[in-house]
């Protein structure tokens, strides 16, 4: 039982401090560092957060967006990964579920999420 506080203390060193507060249903823009050969560039991925899992260093979230020709694309990111350059909150959404898997079967206006006010 002595291991848990030590692990917790070590993990706290690797937590990011610059992550904004966001929830499931919010629209976020995630900037990811992409390495192509010797070059490194930033690639943005914007979409709706459909899931958040775990806590601490292992916390991750899934973002869904509709790409060209109406094809849905989902990417899962580790929140505290060094590959993530930043997360920007674009829009807040009002939802009542913890996971928005039902959006996978919806397209167009049926996939809209109301905006949370205040």
From Swiss-Prot:
InterPro entries: Ribosomal_bL19, Ribosomal_bL19_sf, Translation_prot_SH3-like_sf. Keywords: Ribonucleoprotein, Ribosomal protein. GO terms for biological process: translation. One of its GO terms (cellular component) is cytosolic large ribosomal subunit. It comes from the Bacteria. GO terms for molecular function: structural constituent of ribosome. It holds the Pfam family Ribosomal_L19. Gene3D superfamilies: 2.30.30.790. PANTHER family: LARGE RIBOSOMAL SUBUNIT PROTEIN BL19M, RIBOSOMAL PROTEIN L19. This protein is located at the 30S-50S ribosomal subunit interface and may play a role in the structure and function of the aminoacyl-tRNA binding site. Belongs to the bacterial ribosomal protein bL19 family. This is Large ribosomal subunit protein bL19. It comes from Herpetosiphon aurantiacus (strain ATCC 23779 / DSM 785 / 114-95). The lineage of its organism: Bacteria, Bacillati, Chloroflexota, Chloroflexia, Herpetosiphonales. The gene is rplS.
């Amino acid at each position: 039982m002595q291991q848990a506080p030590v692990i917790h203390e070590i993990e706290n060193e690797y937590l990011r401090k610059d992550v904004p507060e966001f929830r499931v249903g919010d629209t976020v823009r995630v900037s990811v560092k992409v390495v192509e050969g010797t070059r490194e560039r930033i690639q943005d991925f914007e979409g709706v957060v459909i899931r958040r899992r775990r806590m601490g260093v292992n916390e991750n979230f899934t973002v869904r967006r509709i790409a060209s020709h109406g094809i849905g694309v989902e990417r899962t990111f580790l929140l505290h990964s060094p590959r993530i350059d930043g997360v920007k909150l674009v829009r807040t959404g009002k939802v009542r579920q913890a996971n928005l898997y039902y959006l996978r079967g919806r397209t167009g206006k049926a996939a809209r999420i109301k905006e949370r006010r205040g």
